[in-house]
């Protein structure tokens, strides 16, 4: 399946977006970010930004869902998890398969 990218979203020229990825309006996928959804879907909500060198990956049975107005800090890894609206994932944080983070949360930088 090919990615679906809203016309108002920004995807950096060297970002990688593969498979069943949906990117909402006004979202930003920045330099060096990798979004891979070959085996389960990834959804990036409206107004969310995925900063430089992040990795978002989905596994069978573990889609990755990132809500609206979220910030995913530089070099964070989101793997088959759900991130609620208006949540900040700090730089270098790692969130793994099956994790569910609520809305209006902060995940500290380098947290696992």
Predicted features, each with a name:
Residues 3, 41-43:
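Surface-exposed loop/turn motifs in large extracellular/passenger domains
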Residues 7, 12-13, 18-19, 24-25, ...:
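Left-handed beta-helix
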């Amino acid at each position: 399946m090919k990615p679906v990218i809203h016309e108002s979203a920004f995807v950096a020229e060297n970002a990688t977006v593969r498979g069943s990825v949906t990117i909402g309006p006004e979202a930003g996928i920045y330099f060096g970010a990798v979004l891979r959804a070959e085996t389960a879907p990834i959804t990036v909500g409206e107004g969310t930004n995925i900063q430089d060198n992040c990795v978002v990956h989905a596994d069978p049975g573990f889609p990755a869902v990132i809500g609206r107005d979220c910030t995913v800090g530089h070099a964070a890894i989101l793997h088959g998890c759900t991130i609620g609206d208006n949540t900040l994932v700090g730089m270098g944080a790692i969130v793994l398969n099956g994790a569910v983070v609520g809305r209006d949360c902060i995940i500290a930088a380098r947290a696992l």
